[in-house]
Amino acid sequence: MARPKKCRRIEFIPKNTYFMPIGKKRCKIEEIKLRLEELEAMRLKDIEGLNQEECAERMQVSRQTFQNIIDSARKKVALALTKGSAINISGGDYTTHHCKFKCLDCEEVYNINYEQDRQKCPSCGSQNVICIKKMGSCNKKCHKDND
């Protein structure tokens, strides 16, 4: 029996999720489904330029799992481009919030949501907050603290 899939962490959810060649009717086009974690793998590796280990750490998966995800993603995109198929970005096994922050004023510990990127404490409103993990897990806030 196969193990259940662990949720992969993603930091980006695209606003545009459907791409198709111009001049083809939607009802007559083959569609390839690109899962959100596959898009995230390509974004981290190809756009942010991270190495495999850094990508795997950000997505909270092993290096081998990351490699499997990105291989699948690149194959799907290549197939869509060469066959003239549509790309539908949706679904997957992912989560968007895992990073814990702590307010230095009231001691509140809370999760941030990457989509909202909370920079102030939800309890007292203080902006005197820090990332508990600090190991690249919450890149948005940690990066701002290091500037």
UniProtKB/Swiss-Prot annotation:
Pfam families: DUF134 (PF02001). It comes from the Bacteria. PANTHER family: PTHR37478, UPF0251 PROTEIN TK0562 (PTHR37478:SF2). Belongs to the UPF0251 family. This is UPF0251 protein NT01CX_1491. The lineage of its organism: Bacteria, Bacillati, Bacillota, Clostridia, Eubacteriales.
